[in-house]
Every structure is written in C-alpha cells, then in structure tokens.
C-alpha cells in the first residue's frame, strides 16, 4: 500500500486523496521509520491541491494549500488536511506551510468555532459555513469534525508550544466531542446541534459509520494528550487523575495527578520518580481562568467576574510569569514532591461576537471547561421559551447519581408566552442547566445552549394552532417529523435556525404527510414552507403537490377549487380551496426525479 502511495501517485497519476487523512498517516510513518519518502509524499499530496482537475472548495482543492486562509468545504476533510499541513509544517520547517496553517486556524477560532468546540455549521455539504455563520438548531458539528479539530490543535501545539491550542482542544474535548457518544458507550451522534425540539437522538449505528468507529478509536488515545515533553520541559496540558511514565532528557520520570476536574479546580501533581534531575514543569493555566473564553474575540465573558489561580510546591506558594499560557516551575525535583494547583471555578455567562446573528441577544453558561444547556427533563416548561435575567446568579448542585455524576446549575429565569388576547406574558421559574455533553440521555425533547437575554432573541410559546394540536403521520417516519407542526417558520430560504423534515434518501417518489385533527374542523387553506439545500445537499422543491381531505366514509379526496400550488423557496406557499369540514387532511408531494424534497412547516386554516 505504501509503495503504491509513494510511486503510483507521483510517477503515473498526479492525483490527491478525495478524503484527506493519508497525509497524517504518511507523516506518522516518517516519524516511525525515518524514511524521507513518506514525508515527501505527504507534502506532495498537499502541494498538488489547487492544480489537479478537481478544484472545488468542498474538498479544499480550490487553491494551493499555502495560499489558503479560510476554512471551507467539508469540515472533516478540512480538519484532516489542516492536521496534515501542521505535520508537514512542523517536520519540514516550511514557512509557507506554517503561515498558511496559522491563518486557517485564526479563521476557525475567530469566525467559525462553536462555543461547544464544534466545527462545521451546515449539513449542506457537512461543511463550514460563511464567516460568523453559526446556527444552533441546524448546527452540524459532526463528531468526526470535533476529533479532527483535536488533531489540528494538538499538532499546532507541538509546532508552536503555546497553551492556546490546548484551550481550544480542551473545549472541544469536554463538550462537542464527547457529546457524540452516549454515557454507556452504546449510542452515537453524527451531528451535535446546540438546540433541539426533540428531533435528535443518539443511534446505535449509521449507514455511514465513520463517527462511531472514530470516537471509539479516539477515546483510548486520550492518555497521550495529557503530557508533552520537549528536551527538559514537561508540559502538563490536561487535568485528570492518572499515573504517567515519561522520558525527560532520556531519563525516567513518573508523575501522578489527583483531581476531580472538571467538577472542581483542585489538581495535585505528585512526583513518584525522577531520574532526570532538574527540569521545568510547565502547567497550562486554562484560558477560562484567565478570562478568555477562546483565543479570539468570537466569544467573551459578559458577567464582569475575574477568576484567579494559585500554585504551591510542597505546601509553599510559588510565583512565576506565564509563558505562552504556562506556569513554569524549574527545579531539581525529587520523589515525593507535590504541586498543588487551584483554579477558581464559578459559573460564567458568555456572549458571542455581535456578527454571529444566531447568538445576538443571547448568553451561554459555562463552568470551568464545561458548557451547560437547558433540557426538558429538568424543567417542567418549554426551555426554548426561557428568558434569562440580566445578571443571573447560579447555584451549583452536585448530582452524583444523575447521568453518571454531574453538577447542575440552577438560576431564576422567566418563561415567555402569550395570553388569550395575544399579549406577551412572563412567568417566573427556576431554571436547571446540565452539562451539554450529557443531553439527550433521557428521551427526546427540547434543549438549548444559547439562552435569550433580549426580547429580540426570545421565542415565546406560541398559541396553539389547528396544525400544532393535530396528530402527524408521514410516509417517512423519522424523529424530525416533529418539525412539521412546531410553529417555527424560516425567515428566508437560507435560514437553518429552524428544524425541518425531509424524505431523503428517497428520490422521484410520491410521498405524503397527514394531520388528524383533535375534532372535526372546517379548513380552506394550506401553507407550506419548502426545504431546499442546494447546491450540495440532496433536497429540492417538489415537482408538484396537492391537498386531500378525508370524507365521511374515511376516504381521501382531493380538495376542490384550489387556486395555486406554489413551489417558491424562502416563503410560505399558500393554496386556498373550497371550505371543507373534515377530521383529517393530507399533503401529497411528487419528488424530483433525482432528488428528495422536504419542508420546514405545514400550516392549515
């Protein structure tokens, strides 16, 4: 296989991988074998992008890699390629590669990175969106992309030695990555959205099963991310109870960590063995302790708090200037030495850059490295209608028997709705938050990470409608069926902030949806908001559609007097017809020959 890679694709066919990852493997082969041909081949594959017959953004082949400065296209392919670029940059010292991967990283962390550490905003191509395009309900954030993001930041740390890369890695690890697997290890998320109305549930397997196998491979590799060694420097990058045997200057060193991190900020690092004499222990001081949500202005803390930290060696406080985010202790260590680190850990509120439209007027809540969310099992009200106080105060509640042991956050909030006269109402409630990674373990229902603090961002519970009170059935029975009558409509054809239903992967077929009313009703119009994810997705507006009603004999009949069955994107397509008294109506659609169809909402009046 490696012989083919290093000969066939150089001498006979100038081609590059359609799905990047070979570059990382080749760099690793170079490190293991010392054979230059593997590193040369990794660089060759990267160098050829932008010069082959395939020049699309989807596969990051739109321009030479050293000219790229924005994360685009399929997020998993991109992350694997960026990790390969970081490998080549570090192993060759090529400044063009170093500058390119630094530019791309700046773009991700500054404009395309979710508060949960996820990347890849849209299901349309499983891709990065535009700058600051970070929707919540439709956030894709593929589990594999989160793993790829860890790969990228780990390699950039190895290249530059700066703690900011581990700040990003840690956020991804504790939130948008481990959310991809259930607490018992038996269910998996492909996408990891930041908001839900109940259309998401972990699955035991997928037809395209990259995520389950990927995360099952990644988790056992985690011990390798805790420490790093360079010459006589030992980097302590992650905080978890462990015993590790290291080589420092070729000599054996054994360290033991004891901690309940991330639930509290106390970490003890003990020296069990040291044959290396004097070395520098570099302890990462996380960005969240230093009042930095992420190493950019994409997110900032909004509560005005200032956290602090302390470091003691054998009970005595020590001081040190931070260097690249690390607290450095240089000494001749001996067996039995103990370093006690304390990080203040309080609930914090976060706001997004105002350019992130989906998060304007909203706050997120985190404590330490953990991002929290509101979920339905802990709250006896619609969590999507929550309205946060201006300066919320949080109580931390330990729940050792809930979801394998978590901390909940509780605070006072309000629920917004409308009374019978259409006036806005606010009801005081006690809101409970749980760690984002632990959501969707107690059944399907509503969840939200970003919580409104401005009326313009709120979503008051809407009055019930005939459609919302109806029983929904469809020819394709999936979780997203709940989107059909959730009373949420898109503001335009590109709005992915509301959920949708589709018939994918069926193509060219006749499909249907039906409403069974609570009681007999007279209806005379239907409005449909079509879903179309061109150009990369597989859904297009239908060829045609019709409305049927159920007659007294229980048979479906087409409505009469229909004026127009519209198929416009981004707006409601209303058909008016002769009034009919019935217990049920049906929407029948004919899909395009080579595509599926879908819809955001179906209203009846």
Protein language model features and the residues they cover:
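Short, small-residue-biased leader/transition segments that mark boundaries at the very start
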Residues: 1-8
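Aromatic, loop-rich ligand-recognition surfaces of beta-strand-rich domains
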Residues: 16, 460-462, 494-564, 569-605
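Short beta-strand elements bearing conserved aromatic residues within extracellular beta-rich modules
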Residues: 281, 309-311, 545-547
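Non-catalytic carbohydrate-binding regions of carbohydrate-active enzymes
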Residues: 92, 99-142, 146-201
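C-terminal beta-rich recognition modules with glycine/proline-rich loops and embedded aromatic residues
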Residues: 42, 101, 167-175, 180-272, ...
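Well-ordered alpha-helical scaffold segments within catalytic/enzyme domains
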Residues: 21-34, 80-95, 107, 133-137, ...
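Core domains of carbohydrate- and sulfate-ester-processing enzymes
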Residues: 32, 37-62, 103-118, 197, ...
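Carbohydrate-binding/catalytic loop surfaces
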Residues: 17-32, 57-80, 118-142, 185-209
